[in-house]
Amino acid sequence: MMFTKLIWMGFFCHLCRGYFDGPLYPEMSNGTLHHYFVPDGDYEENDDPEKCQLLFRVSDRRRCSQGEGGQASSLLSLTLREEFTVLGRQVEDAGRVLEGISKSISYDLDGEESYGKYLRRESHQIGDAYSNSDKSLTELESKFKQGQEQDSRQESRLNEDFLGMLVHTRSLLKETLGISVGLRDKYELLAHTIRSHGTRLGRLKSDYLEGGGQKMG
C-alpha cells in the first residue's frame, strides 16, 4: 500500500516537474487546449514563451509564462473576452484598411465597376488616340505631298518663265543688233552725204571766188 502511494506521489511529482519526452499532445497543458512545442522536452513554468509555439488557446491559464513584465506574457494573460475585443479591433482596423484600399481602387478605376471595364475603356481611348494620330499623320503626309507638287509646279513655272525671259532677251538682243547695223549703215550714208555736200560747197566757193575776180579785173 505504501509502495503504491510512493508510485502515485512519484507520478504526480513527475507531472509537476513537467518533463515530457513523448509526442506532442494537448494533455500536456492540463486540458487548457494549449499546444506548446518545448525544444528540450522539459516543460517548466519559466520556459521562454518565444521558444514555445502556441497553436491555439481558449483559456486564460498560462503554462509558458515569462512574467508579468514582458509583452508576450501580457498577450498570454488576456482572457477570452479580451482576446475577442482585441480581435474585434483588429477586424475594424482591417475593415478600415480594406475601405481605404477600395477607395483607392475606385479612384484608380475612375468610376468603372471593375478593372476589366476600366482597361477596356483605356484600351478604347488608346485605340482612338492611335487612330486620331494615324489620321493626323496621313493628313500631314498628304499635305506634304501637295506641298511637294506645288513646289514642283512652281519650280517648273519659274523655269518656264526664266526660259521665256531668255528667249525674249535673245530676241531683243537680235533686234538691237539689227538696229545697230542699220544705224551704222545710216551713219555711213550720212557721212558720205556730208562729204559730198562739203565737196559741192567747196566747188561753189571756188567758183564764186573765181567769178568775182574776173568782174573786178
From Swiss-Prot:
Glycan attachment sites: 30
Keyword field: Disulfide bond, Endoplasmic reticulum, Glycoprotein, Golgi apparatus, Secreted, Signal
An example molecular function term from Gene Ontology annotations: protein homodimerization activity
Pfam family, one: Fibin
InterPro entries linked: Fibin (IPR026772)
Subcellular location: Secreted; Golgi apparatus; Endoplasmic reticulum
Signal peptide, first to last residue: 1-18
GO (cellular component) term, any one: endoplasmic reticulum
Family membership noted in the UniProt record: Belongs to the FIBIN family.
Self-association and partners: Homodimer; disulfide-linked. Seems to also exist as monomers.
Protein name: Fin bud initiation factor homolog
Organism whose genome encodes this protein: Rattus norvegicus (Rat)
Designated gene of the protein: Fibin
